Amino acid sequence: MVVDKIQAIRGMNDILPDSTSVWRFIEQTFINCLVRYGYKEIRFPIVENTQLFKRTIGEITDIVEKEMYTFNDLNGDSITLRPEGTAGCVRACIEHGLLHNQQQKLWYLGPMFRHERPQKGRYRQFNQFGVEALGITGTAIELELISICRRLWTDLGFSQSVQLQVNSLGEINERQKYRSILVEYLRDHFQILDEDSKRRLDKNPLRVLDSKNPDLQQLIQNAPKLIDVLGDDSREHFQSFCNGLETLGIPYSINPVLVRGLDYYGQTVFEWVTDQLGSQATICAGGRYDMLVEFLGGAPTPAVGFALGLERIFLLMETLNLLNESNNKQSIFIIATNEEAILKALVMAESIRNAHPSLDVITNTTGGGFKSQFKKADKSGARLALILGEDEIAREYVSIKDLRTEIEQISIPMTKINEFLQDYLA
């Protein structure tokens, strides 16, 4: 009987063992950095009430209109696989009373879902790392988030390959004033607009500035600038932010048509972009969203955050040939030729793990010839092969072969192995 193979859903990719060590390195780099800054992890459901995203992201957005995985459950309730993390994070904070006269610095990591056209660096299930700071006013916290990003890029090795772009969306009344100016401008060029932009013109014209249609880019660049209608308070806030970037030595450029693709943003917004992935690509984006908590039924609460897609980070590191550098942890492969040697190998492996917690120790438990085991050892990426053959067992010695150099193989007493590793791998 021929059985059809079931494959992964289009745009939802498997991450295989050859890549997971690099993914783990990227994830752990993020986590270590945020812990050093005093941020704490929060976890919330992958599935939420659909209204959560319609209310926060905005109904006239590509995400809500075209990209959300929405369906009715067995009770007839409309639920949605989360397309982004901020709304769920804020919902959890409100529901569990985390914002009552408190400040929260939080991070999260997990899968998000959008029914987009799959392409390089963009998938229907993608992994997002998010950072949110709630209950904190002023530009200092915005500057801290930018500093976190810069440290992440440095730790991952590509700080020279990304650029920071910033803008201000001002207060809601300023955006409303700008909206009228923008609509008038766009109506004067109505014949140029694509169907999506025409549809957005009355309901959410700022979305036109977020269009990726290459035929509209000149029109967008020539559009009136929101920054020109900002009031004194918004100008002062943005100037304070820019001054802080200069004090911290963080290069930036002001992008006057930078708007975030989600309705809840206001005041400072930013993106980190790179030209290493073909056309200019955004690898991280964020900004201030002081109205979001109130949108969801909470008390007015200042908030700011950012998010980045791990697939895009992986792709950038791959392009810059940084993946091997991220996977250079020292490891050892123990070769054992028979049952007695395998038992000795298991004992030795535990001893090494106890004495050297940072070392990865791989033990061959299936026996086999030396040639096949050396192939396995080399393929594993191990630095050293520890060999326990019949001669070694008889003499209670272990032979050691450096798999990455031409250094001659040596033998030492088994009791000296931890001392040897301490010196050799220092």
Swiss-Prot record:
Keywords: Aminoacyl-tRNA synthetase, ATP-binding, Cytoplasm, Ligase, Nucleotide-binding, Protein biosynthesis. It catalyses: tRNA(His) + L-histidine + ATP = L-histidyl-tRNA(His) + AMP + diphosphate + H(+). GO terms for molecular function: ATP binding; histidine-tRNA ligase activity. Its EC number is 6.1.1.21. The keyword Phosphoprotein does not apply. The keyword Nucleotide-binding applies. GO terms for biological process: histidyl-tRNA aminoacylation. It is an enzyme of class 6 (ligase). One of its GO terms (cellular component) is cytoplasm. SUPFAM superfamilies: Class II aaRS ABD-related, Class II aaRS and biotin synthetases. Transmembrane segments: none annotated. Belongs to the class-II aminoacyl-tRNA synthetase family. NCBIfam families: hisS (TIGR00442). Homodimer. This is Histidine--tRNA ligase. It comes from Legionella pneumophila (strain Lens). The gene is hisS.
